[in-house]
Amino acid sequence: MPLTTFPHSSHQTAVNTHATTVLRGLQARSKGNPITGKQIGAALGIAGPAVRAIVHRLREQGHPIGSSGQGYWYAGSPTELAPTITHLEQRIRSMAAAADGLRRAFNPQ
């Protein structure tokens, strides 16, 4: 059975259902008053991966959502977003290095 024939997962349903609510909540948060993913999940009855997927989708749509170890917030300036962007770019480089390692696993140079 092709993967495309499976119904939406509960994770995807949670993302679709709660994205607007999460956005409204984050718009009320500043860098000085962040909310954790755990708090968002508890308030909405969803798991951490769904919270992260919602934040990811909102960022893809252009919403300036910053994050740190303290939680998430709606950024008010590019300066507030800079550390989040740097962190995401570091993750990209790390994942690319892992992918390169996997490519070499059966094709050593």
Language-model-derived ranges and their functions:
Residues 2, 84-109:
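Long, low-complexity, charge-rich intrinsically disordered regions
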Residues 2-23:
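Short alpha-helical segments that sit at the start of domains
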Residues 26-32, 61:
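Short helix-capping/hinge SLiMs at alpha-helix to coil transitions
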Residues 36-42:
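A short acidic, leucine-rich amphipathic alpha-helix
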Residues 46-57:
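Short amphipathic alpha-helical interaction segments
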Residues 59-69:
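A short, conserved structural fragment
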Residues 68-76:
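Minor-groove-contacting beta-hairpin "wing" of winged helix-turn-helix DNA-binding domains
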Residues 78-84:
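Short, charged/polar, Gly/Pro-enriched secondary-structure boundary elements
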